[in-house]
Amino acid sequence: QSEIGEDGHPQRGGFLPPVPLPRRMWAGGRLRWEAANPLQVGQDVERVSTIQSVKHKTGRTGELLFVQVEHRFGNADGLCVTEEHDIVYRAAAQPGEAAPTPQTPPLAGQQQWSRVITPDDVLLFRYSALTFNGHRIHYDRKYVTEVEGYPGLIVHGPLIATLLVDLVRRSLPHAQ
């Protein structure tokens, strides 16, 4: 617990660089599975993590720092999965500063599949627990509104990806 920061993430300056910007957000990620060497339940697995890049940018909301982290998972036979995380760090919210309003892109026409899901506090907490994600913006309403300055809990980017994959699985049950 002594290595966890106020926001619920590991403190910066250990594995992650000592970034001076306090707000951390998921900006994207990628997964690559090695079809010839799939992970199997019960196998011993080793994870090797490296920082691939650190890039400074200035955006419409101010200073930004993008960190790309790669995690390589392997078993006795070699590499099984490569996971990349794109993390963005931002300046702290200023008192009275309104959080940006999310913009929903217009739908392009008739959707082949759809499913309405309204994430609630319990779903966000459970997904945080399932993925060992201690970032308080996903489950601590007081923290996310009073410290981070957002209007409410933040839905995990990977949860959205998981729900999209589940929609495809439900819509194409016989696809591989």
Predicted regions: what they are:
Residues W26-P119:
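HotDog/MaoC-like acyl-thioester-processing domains
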Residues H156-L164:
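Catalytic-loop motifs flanking and including active-site residues across diverse enzymes
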Residues V165-Q176:
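A conserved acidic, glycine/proline-rich C-terminal tail/linker
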Residues P22, W26, H138, H156:
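Histidine-centered active-site/metal-ligand motif
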Residues Q1, I87-V155, R169:
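Catalytic strand-loop segment that frames the active site of acyl-thioester-processing enzymes
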Residues Q1-D44, L172:
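Hydrophobic, proline/glycine-rich low-complexity stretches
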Residues P22-R23, R47, Y143, P151:
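N-terminal hydrophobic or amphipathic segments with adjacent small-residue motifs
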